[in-house]
């Protein structure tokens, strides 16, 4: 039987090297993440007067992405001023945003 003092030391050592992901983040961390996603998606949309529609949706870590719906006006000459809607996927690993038109979601 191991020494009673050895067990906590072994558990502590294993916990520091274990690849188990954190199960929760602080409220401040989630708020910062939402702000980062919003800024990246608004910028990537290319829409004039871009704004989020609803809230940022964070998928679990197995997906590694967050999503946002962005509305605004198209700047391109043929569609200038028309309302546009884009779906944005934010990759949490690369911290990059990709957008695709989502006008049919109206």
What is the meaning of each model-derived region?
Residues 1-6:
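Positively charged n-region of N-terminal signal peptides that target proteins for export
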Residues 8-18:
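Bacterial N-terminal signal peptides
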Residues 20-106:
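Mitochondrial intermembrane space
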């Amino acid at each position: 039987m191991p020494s009673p003092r050895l067990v906590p030391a072994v558990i502590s050592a294993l916990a520091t090297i274990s690849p188990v992901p954190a199960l929760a983040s602080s409220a401040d961390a989630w708020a910062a993440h939402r702000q980062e996603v919003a800024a990246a998606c608004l910028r990537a949309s290319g829409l004039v007067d871009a704004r989020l529609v609803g809230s940022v949706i964070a998928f679990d870590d197995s997906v590694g992405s967050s999503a946002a719906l962005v509305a605004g006006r198209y700047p391109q000459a043929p569609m200038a001023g028309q309302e546009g809607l884009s779906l944005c996927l934010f990759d949490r690993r690369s911290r990059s945003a990709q957008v695709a038109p989502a006008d049919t979601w109206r």
